[in-house]
């Protein structure tokens, strides 16, 4: 079971989220059949979305779009406050060579572009916020977004590690944020600790990477666990939802599908589930429009 643990320092100067997103990213890889580089890029974006959604309340939904300049295309993820996230990459079969040490490169793979966050509070008029991709590594781009767009100094680390067969081995990350009222010496102490932290890849390799992350963030400093919540890859598509989408098409288009194709097959981009609509379904839609 994947989870996110929310914590706050005893002094109230900082808060930290730590995540185990292994099954989330593994499910995404299985559904989209992504190559190594696209698995890591999509996985990091899914984790980034889980972090952002954990910061919201109510029925808020967050869409993250990593709009890079490479042949990978856009990475699009959607997360809600109930722990659900879904996502896809436009060209999952695109891949680049690993480094000599076997490292999967993401920054050069994603390229230059924009980090777009769409926040939908469920009341209409979603709020869009855009910052440039500063590295394409996703974690650094999320930290820059939080610092620039939300005016909250943040440190982010996230990664996806693959095994010898390029299958997801472990995935997770962390967010650390300065809270209002933090003293200069507290900020300096935490900044030093973050700078001296082992690489996120090293921490994820630990037997219990959640505890390893918390230890690296807080050291010997006291902190409180505020909550532990389940997170997962979960798509909200359905036959009914796609039926409603078809209903928005002109009757002439529906008639053409009925007569020439004898139905239509639709595949959800987010989870690759396929839905079939036969002539009877299309006839019903046409009749409802008349």
UniProtKB/Swiss-Prot annotation:
Gene3D superfamilies attached here? Hsp33 domain, HSP33 redox switch-like
Q: Name one GO cellular component term.
A: cytoplasm
Entry keyword Transmembrane helix: no
One term of GO molecular function: protein folding chaperone
Keyword line: Chaperone, Cytoplasm, Disulfide bond, Redox-active center, Zinc
Q: Which SUPFAM superfamilies does this UniProt record tie to the protein?
A: Hsp33 domain (SSF64397), HSP33 redox switch-like (SSF118352)
**Can you summarize the PTM annotation of this record?**
Under oxidizing conditions two disulfide bonds are formed involving the reactive cysteines. Under reducing conditions zinc is bound to the reactive cysteines and the protein is inactive.
Among InterPro entries, the record links this protein to: Heat_shock_Hsp33 (IPR000397), Heat_shock_Hsp33_C (IPR016154), Heat_shock_Hsp33_N (IPR016153)
Q: Which cysteines are joined by disulfide bonds?
A: 235-237, 268-271
* Family recorded in the similarity comment: Belongs to the HSP33 family.
Q: Which HAMAP family match?
A: HslO (MF_00117)
Q: What is this protein called?
A: 33 kDa chaperonin
The gene it comes from is hslO
């Amino acid at each position: 079971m994947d989870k996110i643990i929310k914590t706050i320092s005893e002094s109230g100067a900082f808060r930290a989220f730590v995540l185990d997103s292994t099954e989330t990213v593994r499910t995404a890889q299985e559904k989209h059949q992504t190559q190594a580089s696209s698995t890591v890029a999509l996985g990091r974006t899914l984790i980034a979305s889980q972090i952002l959604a954990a910061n919201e309340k109510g029925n808020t939904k967050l869409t993250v779009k990593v709009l890079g300049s490479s042949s990978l295309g856009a990475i699009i993820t959607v997360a809600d406050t109930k722990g659900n996230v879904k996502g896809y990459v436009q060209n999952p079969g695109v891949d680049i060579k690993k480094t000599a040490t076997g490292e999967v490169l993401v920054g050069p793979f994603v390229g230059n572009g924009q980090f777009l966050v769409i926040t939908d509070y469920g009341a209409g008029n979603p709020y869009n916020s855009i910052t440039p991709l500063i590295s394409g590594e996703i974690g650094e781009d999320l930290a820059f977004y939080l610092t620039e767009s939300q005016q909250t100094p943040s440190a982010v680390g996230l990664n996806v590690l693959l095994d010898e067969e390029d299958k997801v081995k472990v995935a997770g990350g962390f967010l650390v944020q300065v809270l209002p009222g933090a003293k200069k010496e507290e900020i300096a102490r935490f900044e030093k600790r973050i700078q001296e932290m082992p690489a996120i890849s090293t921490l994820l390799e630990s037997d219990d990477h959640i505890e390893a992350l918390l230890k690296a963030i807080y050291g010997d400093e006291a902190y409180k666990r505020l909550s532990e919540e389940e997170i997962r890859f979960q798509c909200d598509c359905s036959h009914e939802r796609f039926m409603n989408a078809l209903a928005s098409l002109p009757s002439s288009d529906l008639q053409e599908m009925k007569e020439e194709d004898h139905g239509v097959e639709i595949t959800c981009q987010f989870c690759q589930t396929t839905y079939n609509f036969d002539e009877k379904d299309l006839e019903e839609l046409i009749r409802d429009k008349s």
